[in-house]
């Protein structure tokens, strides 16, 4: 169907939502804008869907949400009556239309006889993950676009273990969603009628209470809050973490917590930040200002759906510096393992899970405590899948999971990255070192002195349109067919191609299988242990380049990182130039 036909179909629909009808009238005559709204269906992929809010098949609106929900409902119905009875838990964040989309999803499922539980107000994504497990539900939905710009919203689907649906199950849901030809013909019953039938239940406080109890269980030294006064500055960046983080810190006894007033309340426009993402250092601007006034020991920031945590601490010059996800992960991991070992509660078969683009310092730390580290593909759903696998087999006992993009999980009562857990543990780690007269920054330098000065970097290259897509393909094809022999003056010794699950030991002309699902990712290791990785985005017209080095000092590792990233990007630029001709 052409975009024009889709547009006409919407325009001629008698009972079209009034707001969307008005939007279409506004766009009348703007061919380009209309084409963008209708030229395709908003894609429902393995991570759910995400897009701009608006009218059309390529936008987030009540009809595209109904379509996704009807597909999920068909998947659940096929599993039988028991699955329908167990039902689906639905949560949402602080974005435009999030409460409406959540209720639309609930109505669509409930109309099909599926029990639904909807939170009474916005909640963090990890609490949704916990609630699925706590209520023994068959699945979960969270309406969020994480830290995308304000004009976006999204929809993520969870399985009965509380983890994001793994690829195999997600593919079946995608099939069901794609089988629906006309999103405008999906009928839903009235909200009140479904509530009267008991098919839509509102949940909230009871889940919060149990979740907070579970949060406090991750503490290794609960007594620290009484022994040390830690000054905390916290910003939820207008999102969902404000109440749960404060509840959790209060339950653990940390009283000296100041919230950034301007960013405390939910705000769909994220008015005070360019991007509500703790990975962006600019997101800490208000927290740093308040931290300086208060002389805070630690600044913590969470993204809108509270699955990512950023922390900032004072460096040796007394200036607040934002730690990378790899650095925060190393501090949390080392604290957990060393303190559990001292208490005799570190299991022999403990395991650390990390993604393939996350720093090797985690493996070095885990190894020093006799623990294995297992790599997964990028995306926390793969970490959740591994936890489930080890839970069933008993091979390993999960200790910690993390990824470089600011996602951490400590207690497996949630199965997605949990910034609430990570925030509580970060404050405890800060208290632990403060008791010894050290800052978190000094603790990090100590870790580097012990394990090596690991340093990582990330660059993104956006190449839009048809030509951009071809250039991204050309970059990967070039590295694949002619792997570089040297980078940054060092020999490339290993090439990993995750698209064919193959590891090639270049110096030995030997091949090994990689036991991970296939993914279009390339990773190269140099003779000095440095590595770099190429990964095209599944949702945007860009390719990400990850770099990692290990040096003898901070300066040395910075220098090595600069040389490696410069060399790789020079090669990439040459490929792009040659395809632009």
Curated annotation (Swiss-Prot):
Reaction(s) catalysed by this chain's protein: alpha-D-glucose 1-phosphate = alpha-D-glucose 6-phosphate
Active site per UniProt: 146 (phosphoserine intermediate)
Residue numbers binding Mg(2+): 146, 303, 305, 307
UniProt pathway annotation: Glycolipid metabolism; diglucosyl-diacylglycerol biosynthesis
GO biological process: enterobacterial common antigen biosynthetic process; glucose metabolic process; purine ribonucleoside salvage
The keyword Isomerase is annotated on this UniProt entry: yes
Alphabetical UniProt keywords: Carbohydrate metabolism, Glucose metabolism, Isomerase, Magnesium, Metal-binding, Phosphoprotein
InterPro entries, per database record: A-D-PHexomutase_a/b/a-I, A-D-PHexomutase_a/b/a-I/II/III, A-D-PHexomutase_a/b/a-II, A-D-PHexomutase_a/b/a-III, A-D-PHexomutase_C, A-D-PHexomutase_C_sf, A-D-PHexomutase_CS, Alpha-D-phosphohexomutase_SF
GO molecular-function term, one example from the UniProt record: phosphopentomutase activity
Annotated effect of mutating residue 162 to D: Very low enzymatic activity. Great decrease in biofilm formation. Deformed cell morphology
Cofactor: Mg(2+)
Keyword hit for Aminoacyl-tRNA synthetase: no
Catalytic EC class: isomerase
Xref: PROSITE patterns: PGM_PMM (PS00710)
EC identifiers of the protein: 5.4.2.2
Name listed for the protein in its UniProt record: Phosphoglucomutase
The organism's taxonomic lineage, starting at the top: Bacteria, Bacillati, Bacillota, Bacilli, Bacillales
Gene name linked to the record: pgcA
């Amino acid at each position: 169907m052409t975009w024009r036909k889709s547009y006409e179909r919407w325009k001629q629909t008698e009972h079209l939502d009034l707001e969307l009808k008005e939007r279409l009238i506004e766009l009348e005559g703007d061919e380009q804008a209309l084409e963008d709204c209708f030229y395709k269906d908003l894609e429902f992929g393995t991570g759910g869907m995400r897009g701009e809010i608006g009218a059309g098949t390529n936008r987030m609106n009540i009809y595209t949400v109904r379509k996704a929900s009807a597909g999920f409902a068909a998947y659940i119905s096929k599993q039988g009556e028991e699955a329908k009875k167990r039902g689906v838990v639905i949560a949402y964040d602080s974005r435009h239309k999030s409460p409406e989309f959540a209720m639309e999803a609930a109505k669509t499922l409930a109309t099909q006889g599926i029990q639904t539980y909807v939170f009474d107000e916005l909640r963090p994504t990890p609490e949704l993950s916990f609630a699925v497990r706590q209520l023994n539900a068959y699945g979960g939905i969270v309406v969020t676009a994480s830290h995308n710009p304000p004009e976006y919203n999204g929809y993520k689907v969870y399985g009965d273990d509380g983890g994001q649906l793994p690829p195999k199950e997600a593919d079946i849901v995608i099939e069901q969603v794609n089988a629906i030809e006309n999103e405008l013909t999906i009928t839903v019953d009235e909200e009140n009628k479904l509530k009267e039938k008991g098919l839509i239940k509102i949940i909230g406080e009871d889940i919060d209470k149990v979740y907070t109890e579970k949060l406090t269980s991750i503490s290794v030294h609960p007594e620290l809050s009484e022994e040390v006064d830690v000054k905390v500055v916290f910003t939820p960046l207008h999102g969902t973490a404000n109440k749960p983080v404060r509840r959790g810190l209060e339950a653990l006894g940390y009283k000296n917590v100041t919230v950034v007033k301007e960013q405390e309340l939910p705000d769909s426009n994220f008015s005070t930040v360019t991007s509500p993402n703790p990975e962006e250092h600019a997101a800490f601007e208000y927290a740093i200002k308040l931290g300086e006034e208060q002389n805070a020991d630690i600044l913590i920031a969470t993204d809108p759906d509270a699955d990512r945590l950023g922390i900032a601490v004072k460096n040796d010059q007394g200036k607040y510096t934002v730690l990378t996800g790899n650095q925060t992960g190393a501090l949390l991991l080392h604290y957990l393992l060393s303190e559990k070992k001292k208490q005799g509660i570190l299991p022999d078969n403990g395991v650390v899970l990390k993604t393939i683009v996350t720093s090797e310092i985690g493996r070095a730390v885990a190894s020093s405590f006799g623990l294995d580290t297992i790599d997964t593909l990028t995306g926390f759903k793969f970490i959740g899948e591994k936890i489930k696998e080890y839970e069933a087999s008993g091979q390993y006992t999960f200790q910690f999971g993390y990824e470089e993009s600011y996602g951490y999980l400590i207690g497996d009562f949630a199965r997605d990255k949990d910034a609430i857990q990570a925030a509580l543990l970060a404050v405890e780690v800060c208290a632990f070192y403060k008791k010894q007269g050290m800052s978190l920054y000094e603790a990090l330098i100590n870790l580097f002195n012990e394990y090596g000065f690991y340093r990582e970097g990330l660059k993104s290259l956006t190449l839009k349109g048809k030509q951009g897509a071809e250039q991204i393909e050309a970059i990967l094809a070039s590295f694949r067919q002619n792997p570089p022999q040297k980078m940054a003056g060092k020999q490339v010794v290993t090439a990993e191609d995750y698209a064919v699950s193959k590891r090639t030991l270049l110096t030995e002309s030997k091949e090994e299988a990689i036991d991970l699902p296939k993914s279009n990712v390339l990773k190269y290791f140099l003779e000095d242990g440095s590595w770099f990785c190429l990964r095209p985005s599944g949702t945007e017209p860009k390719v990400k380049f990850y770099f990692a080095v290990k040096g003898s000092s901070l300066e040395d590792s910075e220098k090595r990182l600069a040389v490696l990233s410069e060399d790789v990007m020079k090669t990439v630029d040459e490929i792009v130039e040659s395809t632009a001709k």
